[in-house]
């Protein structure tokens, strides 16, 4: 039994190890051994402290570069920011621990009002991406998008 706990930060600082252990202990099946790369003690109903294991995922930063053609007739003030925000919202909803970043899936949220066409889309795990291949995320990692890593021109 392994819990992979992502707290929304790159260093795991939002939720303490003790709080993670308490959460795992609360929902852990009885008699099933827990495993993981991190651990902490938490009190049980028996009054004893129990060592609980869990894993924090490796954060994989995702960089994306969109080249677009705008449609000024739509009257949208800043469709480039709207596109970036739509991709971020999509990523927050879609990408969990172990979920691959599928290159073609990023076209869907990118078509916001004011965008006529997407002429190029590149993704990668380093600045200035040039790839169109999917980003494979293993079971102990999570793809994380950030507005500072999405470029729209």
Which role does the model predict for each range below?
Residues 75-153:
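An aromatic-glycine-centered, glycine-rich loop/turn in mixed alpha/beta architecture
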Residues 1-99:
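Carbohydrate-recognition loop of C-type lectin domains
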């Amino acid at each position: 039994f392994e819990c992979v706990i992502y707290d929304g930060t790159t260093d795991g600082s939002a939720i303490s190890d003790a709080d993670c252990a308490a959460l795992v202990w609360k929902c852990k099946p009885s008699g099933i051994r827990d495993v993981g790369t991190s651990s902490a003690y938490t009190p049980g109903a028996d009054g004893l402290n129990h060592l609980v294991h869990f894993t924090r995922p490796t954060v994989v930063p995702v960089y994306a570069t969109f080249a677009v053609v705008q449609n000024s007739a739509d009257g949208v003030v800043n469709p480039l920011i709207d596109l970036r925000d739509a991709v971020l919202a999509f990523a927050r909803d879609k990408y969990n621990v172990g979920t691959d970043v599928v290159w073609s899936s990023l076209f869907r949220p990118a078509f916001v009002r004011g965008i006529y066409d997407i002429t190029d889309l590149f993704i990668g795990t380093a600045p200035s991406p040039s790839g169109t291949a999917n980003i494979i995320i293993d079971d102990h990692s999570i793809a994380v998008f950030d507005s500072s890593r999405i470029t729209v021109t």
